């Protein structure tokens, strides 16, 4: 049973970005996920299968072209966020594809453009835009296969290196968010997390999902592993088959998740709506239903198909009502 402590106070904020310190009594910050609906922000990628068919010279030229394009696209994404007053941006997990291949071609290209990457990171801080990441579904730290666990760690190492090259802090301010993975493997999950490299663990967060782990289970893992929990209200109602975002357990788990954040002002949550029905796991185009408790959320990633259009719509009917 989860114990809710509503008397919890915020920790000292001296080491936080100045903008984070100024959030008291502010409206929630709504975040853009990876790309824009109007195609202004679109990243390029390459599959492993196609890559392996290329010669070494072709691999290098192809990856260099993709990386430089995506670097410019990341710059454009920050510009878009600035122009649309968005202070939260989720970076694409495919920003620099295949940079962890054994031939080290992608890795070497990243080193070559490291100065430009650092400038992007500096720009995000100058614009007061928080950048976060959600690695793909292949990250399964709770797997009973040692090979899958090692592959998962390798993926996280790739993303952590990108964040380091961007100069982003090794803290949940620049979080890398994953799901629990294989069900009924909580102890394995805790064990693997405890042994992760510092540049991964210092940024790692866990999110409740709609299939394998209940919100309470992920909360308990986060407490034991001493990492923050990203609460997803839609996953909660899907997993528990609830009929309202304002079910008491939604607010209870929102507050429980807040307990896992050393700095509650950094707490980040997700929102999506069902496409065809309230409990539909597929994301809708817009957000037309919000948990009342989310008015107390500092940071909200908007997971809707129409991206910035959904954010503008949400601002018009929800934030304006605060």
From Swiss-Prot:
EC code(s) of this entry: 3.-.-.-
Keywords for the protein's UniProt record, in alphabetical order: DNA damage, DNA excision, DNA repair, Endonuclease, Hydrolase, Nuclease
Entry GO MF terms: endonuclease activity
Root EC class: hydrolase
Ranges in coiled-coil conformation: none
Domain of life, per lineage: Bacteria
Record bears the keyword Nuclease: yes
Gene3D superfamilies (UniProt xref): Divalent-metal-dependent TIM barrel enzymes
GO BP field: nucleotide-excision repair; pyrimidine dimer repair; response to UV
Keyword Transcription regulation: no
Role: Component in a DNA repair pathway. Removal of UV LIGHT damaged nucleotides. Recognizes pyrimidine dimers and cleave a phosphodiester bond immediately 5' to the lesion.
Family that this chain belongs to: Belongs to the uve1/UvsE family.
Protein name from the UniProt record: UV DNA damage endonuclease
Originating gene: uvsE
């Amino acid at each position: 049973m989860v114990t809710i402590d509503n008397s919890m106070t915020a920790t000292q904020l001296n080491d936080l970005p100045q903008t984070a310190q100024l959030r008291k009594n502010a409206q929630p910050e709504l975040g853009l996920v990876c790309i824009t609906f109007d195609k202004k922000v679109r990243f390029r990628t390459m599959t492993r299968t196609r890559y392996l068919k290329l010669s070494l010279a072709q691999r290098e030229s192809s990856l260099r072209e993709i990386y430089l394009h995506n670097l410019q696209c990341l710059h454009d994404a920050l510009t878009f966020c600035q122009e649309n007053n968005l202070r939260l941006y989720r970076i694409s997990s495919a920003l620099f594809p295949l940079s962890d291949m054994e031939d080290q071609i992608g890795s070497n290209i990243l080193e070559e453009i490291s100065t430009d990457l650092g400038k992007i990171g500096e720009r995000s801080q100058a614009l007061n835009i928080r950048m976060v990441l959600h690695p793909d579904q292949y990250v399964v730290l709770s797997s009973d296969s040692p090979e899958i666990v090692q592959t998962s760690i390798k993926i996280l190492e790739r993303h952590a290196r990108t964040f380091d090259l961007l100069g982003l802090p090794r803290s949940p301010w620049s979080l890398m968010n994953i799901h629990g993975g294989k069900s009924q493997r909580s102890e394995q999950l805790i064990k693997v997390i405890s042994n992760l490299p510092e540049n991964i663990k210092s940024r790692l967060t866990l999110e409740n999902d709609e299939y394998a782990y209940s919100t309470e289970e992920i909360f308990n893992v986060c407490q034991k592993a001493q990492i923050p929990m990203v609460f997803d209200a839609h996953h909660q109602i899907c997993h528990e088959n609830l009929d309202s975002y304002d079910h008491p357990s939604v607010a209870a788990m929102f507050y429980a998740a807040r307990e896992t954040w050393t700095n509650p002002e950094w707490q980040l949550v997700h929102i999506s709506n069902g496409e065809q029905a309230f409990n539909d796991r597929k994301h809708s185009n817009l957000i037309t239903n919000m948990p009342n408790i989310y008015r107390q959320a500092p940071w909200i990633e908007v997971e809707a198909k129409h991206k910035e259009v959904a954010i503008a719509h949400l601002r018009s009917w929800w934030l304006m009502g605060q």
